[in-house]
UniProtKB/Swiss-Prot annotation:
Keywords, in A-Z order: Molybdenum cofactor biosynthesis, Nucleotide-binding, Phosphoprotein
Top-level taxonomic group: Bacteria
Subunit (UniProt): Heterotetramer of 2 MoaD subunits and 2 MoaE subunits. Forms a stable heterotetrameric complex of 2 MoaD and 2 MoeB during adenylation of MoaD by MoeB. During catalysis MoaD shuttles between the two heterotetrameric complexes.
Name of the protein in its database record: Molybdopterin synthase sulfur carrier subunit
Pathway: Cofactor biosynthesis; molybdopterin biosynthesis
One GO location term (cellular component): molybdopterin adenylyltransferase complex
A Pfam family the protein falls into: ThiS
Function: Involved in sulfur transfer in the conversion of molybdopterin precursor Z to molybdopterin.
GO MF: nucleotide binding
Family stated for the protein in its record: Belongs to the MoaD family.
Lineage: Bacteria, Pseudomonadati, Pseudomonadota, Gammaproteobacteria, Pasteurellales
Modified residues (Glycyl adenylate): G81
1-thioglycine: modified positions: G81
Organism expressing this protein natively: Haemophilus influenzae (strain ATCC 51907 / DSM 11121 / KW20 / Rd)
Length: 81
């Protein structure tokens, strides 16, 4: 099982802060693609190129491998000012 967390605008758009996935996924990108198919809000919130991912609390590329028991967090890039 994968624990998937959503933060900031990503969470606001989909209205969910966390879900668990039973399916096997090879990469964080495969998880993103799967979730983006859940509907328009999900696709917008998880748009590739406008999203960062952390696996087990470490910032990683979307192409990184994931395994059963991992925590995957999706969030928009942080901006400052």
């Amino acid at each position: 099982m994968l624990n998937v967390l959503f933060f900031a605008q990503t969470r606001e758009l989909i209205g969910v802060d966390a879900i668990q996935l039973e399916d096997d996924f090879a990469t964080a990108e495969a998880v993103r693609e799967h979730l983006a198919q859940k509907g328009d809000k999900w696709a917008l919130a998880l748009e590739k190129g406008k999203l960062l991912v952390a696996i087990n609390q470490t910032l990683m590329p979307l192409e990184s491998a994931v395994k059963n028991g991992d925590e995957i967090a999706f969030f928009p890039p942080v901006t400052g000012g």
